[in-house]
Amino acid sequence: PSQCAICHAWPAARICTDCIRAYARPRLRCSHCAILLPVAAMPAQVVTDEPLCADCLQQSAMPAVDTCLAAVSYRWPWQQCIDVFKFGGQPGWAGALAGLMTARAAIVEAVQLCDVLLPMPLHPQRLAKRGYNQSLLLAKALRQQVHHHAGLQRQQAVIHRSWLQRTRHTTPQSLLPLAERRRNIRGAFAVSARHAPQLQDKRVLLLDDVLTTGASAQAAAQALRAAGAAHVGVLVLARTEKA
């Protein structure tokens, strides 16, 4: 039997249903950067709206991105789980963390509507060091769960791990001050010339584990736009919050 990593209940899934209900409730977020908005919970009538935070109303940090969705906030208890998955050599967390994403109807719908689901790529050096791309594992687990949720009548989203490439090795964004992150990541992504024609007029969903400033998402979205993508949405497991 398994023990819940949050409440330590026996027997339970890696993350039990009670903890998902308690700590991963849908929250009202900016539709463009996924920052948490000052509302305790998301009323049903808001789901189809596109609320914006004050910063995005003035000037978006991710102008190449059409929409942005996040499942949870990058804080307790999810920060510890994500860090173990990403840095602790435990790829087996992918399924449980993808479950936090499929708990949100808007995320399930976004995956169902996209033409292509692209995981945020790692540079080959970082991939070799870590041993796996956590965003690719999340994408695979998410697609499987969404497909199960929707039933066999709906085609699964297509995942392409090599269409979007990391063209240069950069300092990890998490090690840099916020002001330096955009400069660090500028020009670090490109779409494979062989696959660029297949992105023409496509609805693309870019998946990453954590969104902080949006610098990586913006740089990747710019490359996808340049290749001809008609719509670029960003989907993240967790969003950091303002201090």
Locations of regions flagged by a protein language model:
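Glycine-rich phosphate/pyrophosphate-handling loop used in enzymes and phosphotransfer proteins
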Residues: 1-243
